[in-house]
Amino acid sequence: MYGIIATWRMALEGISKADSMLKNNESAADSIEEAIKAVEDFEYYKSVGYGGLPNEEMEVELDAAFMDGDTLEFGCVGGVKDFANPVSIARSLMHYDANNFLVGQGAEKYASRHGFERKTMLTDRAKIHYHNRTKEITNTELKPYSGHDTVGMVCLDHDGHMTSATSTSGLFMKHPGRLGDSPVCGSGFYVDSFVGGASATGLGEDVMKGCVSYEIVRLMKEGMHPQQACEKAVHDFDLELKRRRGKAGDMSLIAMNNKGEWGCATNIEGFSFVVATETQAPTVYLVNHDEDGKCTFEVASKEWMDNYMATRTAPLVRK
């Protein structure tokens, strides 16, 4: 059995590529890296990689992580500017005994020394988004922070090896240097090949308060199906944050166990995810949730899929 699951519709092309690789007995590590890179390289996905939305100083700062479920080794980078594929940099850090999590200039120096591709990641399209949002904030006192759609994945190969990886440009209009949950082991991602893995998307500052990805893996280790584990972890922590703070940020989690069974839970409307297994072609699901945290899925319609791409590739006009 093999399988791969990812946050958001934007992962579909990458998941399709990984599905083909896994069918050909390629590793979970190589398959998930290629899947994440496909998202990083597509400029119309504005929360990851090339074309990612900038911080408040109009700089694109990228975060990424990679974890091996066999060894529990991980590599992470944060606040990286002008490198094409931060997930590949993160993967390369995984095998060191120390210095596995590098940020800012330190991460960039490491990437340069090790020959990773430099690339100007701020696109003209992202500049238009920035200028339009700046004007909206000035005119209407809108909250600047929005757009925190991390691509996160969990992968299982034919040999039972599991991996997890994430990549994001973080909150739109974030303070320079801000890091969310995406590169933080246990919060944005976690995987154990003896159990399974999970990955998060949403408001990182809140996801980190509960180490929600690790919590889902812990619940699976206790015997819960991935769907039960996701629903319990997300709903319980959503309630806990509201009890303590009166509010909870966006949280959506995906998971897969070492049998290829999968699950998803969210506290928002409009969440989508993609899954492929040995017995299921790459499929986009839309998620609905009730007040008790129970989630139901429906396959995205052709109309929904067409509208998704049309919206993201539509021409932009500077206001």
Residue ranges and their predicted role:
Residues 1-319:
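Alpha/propeptide regions of enzymes that mature by internal proteolysis
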